[in-house]
């Protein structure tokens, strides 16, 4: 750092000068110095996702489509496979399972339209937009119990009067619970996504037996038959609970999933969830603790040890507490089903457009969880003998799906086609559009006589069939290709839709009235009155 110093005149150098007050002036030059702070570059711009309203034109043509009565019956706790001892093949059907309906729609471009001038097939393509939906539920309201004959229950920690420090080898008991109450409906054109806690990968390889496994949040599609959260959490019980007795039978060897609302709401194109309806209800009925060795010991600083004469309090009991869930009362006043819902504005960028001519409707309804008990006698007896009766357990469900679809068209400009190909490349293939590949710059071989035996076989490989992207997933298929109708007034949901639009639904058949006959006298009288 350079500096310039200017001193005042000193009297010793100038004897003729009278001494005055002298001050020193210091001037310092400012030099540029590089900053130690980080320089942040502007972020990369995010590619803009268009709303379907920007390139989809809606028409004034609406169709009604509805399924038949959808029924399913099975065992509420487990599936019974066919074996040598059992000739029955009973599936697992529980009210605490997801019902994921894959609704297949007809191709509107191959549909018999009332007016062929609606769209230009050379420059436009037709798509369906879901504007109304009603999920009907049959059968009465009821509460179904779940449980385990060997449930891991040690002490009643709600009304306990002694601390049991000594744990026996087996203290399991027969416990039943009424699970968490859930009503759910998710509508989208792709399968919904669920999340659950699973077993992760440990960082250290020398893990000892009995160490707590790491947890990992896993996201996977929700399939038909997957279990919902029943009050014990969304987790993989088969891999995280080795004793098979910490939860009821219906979930002790399966995975309970919870809808990934955050992930589906943040999805760029908004295909998996147009909208959703949800109602959850839960409270803790009983409080207990678990039997087993304490994996995480309670620190000594958190309690004062008891004396050996204090009635068993010298050793603390299990501190792994767990409640038994309860969904409480079910009532028709809080039902989400058997009523119409109209889609005006979806939560994402897809405003109800059914890409690939399909729709996914995910339903959960635990308010109709009644488990039917069937009793069959093995032999006739004059007196009651419980050993001469067989008890069976079954659960049945009834559904009805109704929709209102609006006919829409997409103008295939080069920009829109490029955008649709980026979003879903199979859409253009379904619409018989292909991409022209750029010419190759390398030299290729072309034989003249293709059928000659002197050259290698020139038979082209057979074209691969289009693969279903959801072929490995399990859904309840509902085919509505032959169930579309323009007569909205002939169906329950169609009449409700017309009432929303303010359109009358009365019949247009007019009653013919016979005109009254006029006599010549009346006509003459009228002519007479007109004379002046």
From Swiss-Prot:
Residue ranges that the Swiss-Prot or TrEMBL entry lists as coiled coil: none
Compartment(s): Virion; Host nucleus
Principal place of residence: virion
Keyword annotations of the record: Capsid protein, Disulfide bond, Host nucleus, Host-virus interaction, Late protein, T=7 icosahedral capsid protein, Viral attachment to host cell, Viral penetration into host cytoplasm, Virion, Virus endocytosis by host, Virus entry into host cell
Gene Ontology molecular function: any one: structural molecule activity
Source organism, top-level taxon: Viruses
Assigned GO CC terms: host cell nucleus; T=7 icosahedral viral capsid
GO biological process terms on file: endocytosis involved in viral entry into host cell; virion attachment to host cell
Any one Pfam family match given in the protein's UniProt record, by short name: Late_protein_L1
Disordered: region residues: 512-532
Family to which this protein belongs: Belongs to the papillomaviridae L1 protein family.
Function text: Forms an icosahedral capsid with a T=7 symmetry and a 50 nm diameter. The capsid is composed of 72 pentamers linked to each other by disulfide bonds and associated with L2 proteins. Binds to heparan sulfate proteoglycans on cell surface of basal layer keratinocytes to provide initial virion attachment. This binding mediates a conformational change in the virus capsid that facilitates efficient infection. The virion enters the host cell via endocytosis. During virus trafficking, L1 protein dissociates from the viral DNA and the genomic DNA is released to the host nucleus.
Assembly information from the UniProt record: Self-assembles into homopentamers. The capsid has an icosahedral symmetry and consists of 72 capsomers, with each capsomer being a pentamer of L1. Interacts with the minor capsid protein L2; this interaction is necessary for viral genome encapsidation. Interacts with protein E2; this interaction enhances E2-dependent replication and transcription activation.
Name of the molecule in the record: Major capsid protein L1
Organism: Human papillomavirus 3
Higher taxonomy: Viruses, Monodnaviria, Shotokuvirae, Cossaviricota, Papovaviricetes
Name of the encoding gene: L1
């Amino acid at each position: 750092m350079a500096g310039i110093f200017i001193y005042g005149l000193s009297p010793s150098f100038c004897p003729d000068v009278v001494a005055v007050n002298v001050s020193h002036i210091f001037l310092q030059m400012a030099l540029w110095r590089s900053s130690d702070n980080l320089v942040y570059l502007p972020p990369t711009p995010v590619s803009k996702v268009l709303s379907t309203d920007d390139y989809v034109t809606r028409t004034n043509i609406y169709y009604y489509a509805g399924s038949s009565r959808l029924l399913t019956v099975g065992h509420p706790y487990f599936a019974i496979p066919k074996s040598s001892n059992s000739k029955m093949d009973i599936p697992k059907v529980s009210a605490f399972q997801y019902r994921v309906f894959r609704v297949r729609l007809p191709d509107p471009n191959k549909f018999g339209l009332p007016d062929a001038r609606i769209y230009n097939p050379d420059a436009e393509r037709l798509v369906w937009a879901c504007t109304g939906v009603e999920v009907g539920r049959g059968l009465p309201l009821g509460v179904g119990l779940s449980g385990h004959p060997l449930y891991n229950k040690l002490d009643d920690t709600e009304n306990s009067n002694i601390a049991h420090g000594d744990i026996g080898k087996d203290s399991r008991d027969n416990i039943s619970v009424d699970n968490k109450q859930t009503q759910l409906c998710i509508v989208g054109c792709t399968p919904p996504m669920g999340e659950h806690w699973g077993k992760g990968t440990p960082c250290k390889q020398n893990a000892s037996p009995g160490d707590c496994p790491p947890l990992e949040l896993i996201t996977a599609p929700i399939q038909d038959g997957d279990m919902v959260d029943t009050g014990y959490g969304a987790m993989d019980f088969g891999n995280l609970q080795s004793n098979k007795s910490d939860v009821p039978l219906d979930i002790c060897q399966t995975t309970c999933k919870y809808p990934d609302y955050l992930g589906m709401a943040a999805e760029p194109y908004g295909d998996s969830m147009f909208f959703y309806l949800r109602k959850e209800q839960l409270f803790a009925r009983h409080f207990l603790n678990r039997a087993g060795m304490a994996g995480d010991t309670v620190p000594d600083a958190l309690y004062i040890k008891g004396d050996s004469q204090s009635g068993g309090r010298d050793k603390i009991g299990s501190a792994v507490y767990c409640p038994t869930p309860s969904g409480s009362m079910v009532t028709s006043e809080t039902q989400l089903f058997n009523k119409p819902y109209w889609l005006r504005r979806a939560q994402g960028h897809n405003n109800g457009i059914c890409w690939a001519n399909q729709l996914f409707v995910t339903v959960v309804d635990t308010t109709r969880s009644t488990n039917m008990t069937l009793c069959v006698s093995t032999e006739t007896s004059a007196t009651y003998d419980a050993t001469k009766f067989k008890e069976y357990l079954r659960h049945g469900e009834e559904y009805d799906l109704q929709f209102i679809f609006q006919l829409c068209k997409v103008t295939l400009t080069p920009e829109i086609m490029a955008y649709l190909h980026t979003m879903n490349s199979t859409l253009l293939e379904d619409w018989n559009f292909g991409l022209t590949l750029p010419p190759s710059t390398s030299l290729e071989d072309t034989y003249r006589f293709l059928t000659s035996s002197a050259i290698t076989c020139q038979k082209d490989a057979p074209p691969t069939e289009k693969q279903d992207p959801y072929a490995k997933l399990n859904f309840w298929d509902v085919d509505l290709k032959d169930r579309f109708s323009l007569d909205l007034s002939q169906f329950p949901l169609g009449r409700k839709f017309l009432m929303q639009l303010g359109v009358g639904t009365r019949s247009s058949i007019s009653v013919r009235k016979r005109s009254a006959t006029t006599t010549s006298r009346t006509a003459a009288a009228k002519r007479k009155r007109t004379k002046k």
